[in-house]
């Protein structure tokens, strides 16, 4: 699959989607994107910057949601203009898609909306690549239906069907907890879409702090290594210069000053895994 200006797939090095959870300010966004660009250039990692102009799904109605669509998109457009990076952001309703698609390179659908057929159809008809997150309530094999919905809508609109990614971000396990089943990554390959692993939301503790979500960022390297060892096309990770002061999802964000070391390890592992054959089908 061609994504932005690079090819993605199990036979290619993993690509990275990374950035702050939410756009907090223009300067921090530019600085964070610039640092990530430097790291990824050094490690030869294809990179897409991500950040949200609005966090529609918050634990509390008083939580920070963002700077608004217009200002958030303006800042993301500055990332493109100043740094030459492709950008990704999530959309939350059909009404937002046209305006967002006019600015960003890749759309993302929130996990909780993966079963909303009209919404998936509208995203698919935007003509943009779409990173479709698997709901925390959804079995991995059910993602085939979601990807098929997107492909059907694209085909009916006369657009390419080869624009959709399936993203794993953990599954609900009791209250305020998520677990990651690495079998899901292999199962989701049956969609014939590139599989992306979200290593930071997978360690989230949804609503675990009462009016906000908690997280266990110390397990991000553990799950990221496991996912790369399983074999993925891409990784998704949120990062922040100072997670303790992040306005959204700080407890599961990777400190920006630790991203280089983590990614260096993951690149080495990815190269080793993709040198050999994937043997899953040989065991049937």
From Swiss-Prot:
Its EC number is 2.5.1.55. Pfam families: DAHP_synth_1. GO terms for molecular function: 3-deoxy-8-phosphooctulonate synthase activity. Keywords: Cytoplasm, Lipopolysaccharide biosynthesis, Transferase. SUPFAM superfamilies: Aldolase. Pathway: Carbohydrate biosynthesis; 3-deoxy-D-manno-octulosonate biosynthesis; 3-deoxy-D-manno-octulosonate from D-ribulose 5-phosphate: step 2/3; Bacterial outer membrane biogenesis; lipopolysaccharide biosynthesis. Belongs to the KdsA family. HAMAP family: KDO8P_synth (MF_00056). This is 2-dehydro-3-deoxyphosphooctonate aldolase. The lineage of its organism: Bacteria, Pseudomonadati, Pseudomonadota, Betaproteobacteria, Burkholderiales.
């Amino acid at each position: 699959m061609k994504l932005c200006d690079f090819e993605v797939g199990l036979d290619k090095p993993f690509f990275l989607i990374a950035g702050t959870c939410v756009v907090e300010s223009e300067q921090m966004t530019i600085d964070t994107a610039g640092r990530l660009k430097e790291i990824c250039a050094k490690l030869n990692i294809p990179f897409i910057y991500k950040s949200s102009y609005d966090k529609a799904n918050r634990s509390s109605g008083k939580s920070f949601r963002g700077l608004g669509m217009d200002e958030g998109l303006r800042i993301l457009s500055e990332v493109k203009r100043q740094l030459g990076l492709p950008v990704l952001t999530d959309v939350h309703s059909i009404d937002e898609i046209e305006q967002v698609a006019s600015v960003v390179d890749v759309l993302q659908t929130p996990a909780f909306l993966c079963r909303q057929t009209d919404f998936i159809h509208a995203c698919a008809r935007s003509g943009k690549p779409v990173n479709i997150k698997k709901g925390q309530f959804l079995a991995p094999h059910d993602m085939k239906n979601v990807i098929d919905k997107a492909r059907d809508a694209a085909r009916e609109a006369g657009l390419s069907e080869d624009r959709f990614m399936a993203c794993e971000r953990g599954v609900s396990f009791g209250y305020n907890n998520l677990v990651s089943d690495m079998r899901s990554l292999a199962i989701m390959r049956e969609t014939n879409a590139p599989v992306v692993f979200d290593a930071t939301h997978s360690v989230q503790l949804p609503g675990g702090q009462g009016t906000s979500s908690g997280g266990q960022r110390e397990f991000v390297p553990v799950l990221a290594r496991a996912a790369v060892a399983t074999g993925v096309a891409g990784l998704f990770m949120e990062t922040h210069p100072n997670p303790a002061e992040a306005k959204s999802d700080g407890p599961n964000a990777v400190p920006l000053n630790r991203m280089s070391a983590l990614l260096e390890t993951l690149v080495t592992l990815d190269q080793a895994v993709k040198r050999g054959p994937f043997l899953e089908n040989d065991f049937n």
